[in-house]
A protein has these predicted regions:
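Short gly/pro-enriched beta-turn/loop segments at secondary-structure junctions
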Residues: 132-135, 147
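FMN-binding flavodoxin-like domain, especially the glycine-rich phosphate-binding loop
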Residues: 1-133
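Iron-sulfur cluster-binding cysteine motifs and their immediate structural context
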Residues: 140, 145-174
Length: 174
């Protein structure tokens, strides 16, 4: 959760943890590294879900796996899930749909059917694809009332609550 900051979470080797990460340009958003620095796997098993806007996951599952392994998790599964694109909702509109949900249920059933969850390798390449961002940032218009809802909802605090007309492009992950 991007909006939860600064508290430690520890798991044990008896735990099975599901991580759902957003994918931007085939990569994890950099704030995920900070958030994960507070998470301690201690041998817990991890299932990774890369959520992307109908473009491509590219190296994201491998990057997620490396991040989780470095935090003490054993990666035992991974899946790609399509959702509406975060900027242009026409891409991935109506997703996940019934076939997507069926595929996810099949994946979950296969995990549950295993006698023992063992580590698996995730697809992707090292070094990861370079992510240069996209030159699109939230902006306000004459319709902006200055209510600050956008600043409250922004997961990376890129929009200044005192001046919601301003977006810090260095923090924005859009």
């Amino acid at each position: 959760d991007y909006t939860t900051r600064g508290y430690e979470v520890s798991f044990s080797s008896d735990d099975l943890v599901f991580f759902c990460f957003p994918v931007y340009g085939g990569r994890l958003p950099t704030p995920m590294y900070d958030r994960m620095s507070y998470v301690h796997g201690n041998g817990a098993k991890a299932v990774l879900v890369a959520v992307y806007g109908n473009r491509a996951v590219e190296d994201a599952l491998l990057e997620m796996s490396d991040l989780c392994l470095n935090r003490g998790f054993k990666v035992v599964g991974g899946a790609e899930m399509i959702a509406p694109h975060s900027i242009d909702k026409r891409f991935g509109a109506g997703r996940p749909d019934a076939p997507d949900i069926a595929a996810l249920n099949k994946f979950l059933s296969s995990l549950m059917a295993k006698q023992e969850l063992t580590p698996v390798a995730m697809p992707g390449k090292r070094p990861y694809k370079e992510y240069k961002g996209i030159p699109v940032y939230p902006t306000s218009s004459s319709k902006c009332s200055g209510c600050g809802t956008c600043a409250q909802e922004c997961p990376t605090e890129a929009i200044d609550p005192g001046d919601p007309q301003h977006t810090d492009k260095s923090k924005c992950i859009s």
